Curated annotation (Swiss-Prot):
Magnesium found in the keyword field: yes
Any single GO CC term annotated in Swiss-Prot or TrEMBL for this entry: chloroplast
EC number: 4.1.1.39
Subunit structure: Heterohexadecamer of 8 large chains and 8 small chains.
Protein name, UniProt field: Ribulose bisphosphate carboxylase large chain
One BP term from GO: reductive pentose-phosphate cycle
Record-annotated membrane-spanning stretches: none
Amino acid sequence: MSQSVESRTRIKSERYESGVIPYAKMGYWDADYVIKETDILALFRITPQPGVDPIEASAAIAGESSTATWTVVWTDLLTACDLYRAKAYRVDPVPNVADQYFAYIAYDIDLFEEGSIANLTASIIGNVFGFKAVKALRLEDMRMPVAYLKTFQGPATGLIVERERMDKFGRPFLGATVKPKLGLSGKNYGRVVYEGLKGGLDFLKDDENINSQPFMRWRERFLYSMEGVNKASASAGEIKGHYLNVTAATMEDMYERAEFSKEVGSIICMIDLVIGYTAIQSMAIWARKHDMILHLHRAGNSTYSRQKNHGMNFRVICKWMRMAGVDHIHAGTVVGKLEGDPLMIKGFYNTLLESDTDINLPQGLFFAQNWASLRKVVPVASGGIHAGQMHQLLDYLGDDVVLQFGGGTIGHPDGIQAGATANRVALESMVMARNEGRNYVAEGPQILRDAAKTCGPLQTALDLWKDISFNYTSTDTADFVETPTANI
């Protein structure tokens, strides 16, 4: 609804008296606001500048991420400005942290273009993050209404269809990243792909920064990689794949590479998060049209997701990427070399895999979310994992995940094929023990030792990496609620 005559007169009068009205008084703060089912909700962690009231800071965030500027403008009176103003409706101190606050903000759905991550982010994480009134600002979580989600296609393939295409059920997918990630010739690269797949992996993959460099151009990589895929598939009698990274400088180049990946028989292609939201959505539309699985590497996310008080939590990226339409996204390992609190990672996985999620503060989920039947995204666990951790990986991450052992395959002393076999035997022995009703978490090391009695490559892997772990205190453990999370 538009403003009343009295309200317009008051605002106009105050503007001419001072030129500036506090954001809270301009209508961007409403403690009595009744949330609509169609509202988009955002939770920000704000650190106001000294002397700035947290309610005023929250109202400023609401204003600057929707319709406001630094002063009242008379053209507000030409719009339904009451409707279009975002409303900060709740501010809570962050427990056990001084001078930080959680600000809950509601946005009317009409503020955003349908089906556009770029337009959504231009408001939610736009200029507001440089606002001087706050020392730091972090987007912790969002709730997307069903009406808005229905304007997005969601994952191009999704978990269920991918399992059917791969004919893999009842266990995680197994993969590995080609190492070294840069410098191999095309022929040697294809040999790595072949050896890994022949040894028992389901997937090999390009890494995030292999595109089309002087030592190996993209077309050469695609041809040799698919030669390895086809030979290994024929040898093993299983469907296998290799994530061909089609990331490039322009969309024209990316489409050309994606089309060629399909022509040479690939079932999956890959992009990097750094290409941007519009390019990601464009590639997701292409992948659905061409029946291709679309893998997303989250390269670049830690530049804004690791800091506790500024940037954006990775769970928000998970939500946006499910909307955008990717089929895979790297989402953490818990036990590997990369950042990841166990409960936070569980929250990421639930965001990608569940049809409905409830509020769960230890997992960092501040809002309940109905996913409006969007397909499930397969989380990918990679970075510093090896066969000796298989019981932990299965316990923390479950079946619906791609476990990628890069160094844990290619670093095996007996060769790549032996490394792949070690991982396949470790996984299948653990899944079998679980299905038999054994306490595979407590008995995990013994289960692996028993399996290694008849699998030399697994024994070698266990001997080599038995003491390898990455026990660092996580930077992303919840500080706003007590959790049982240990440093694992």
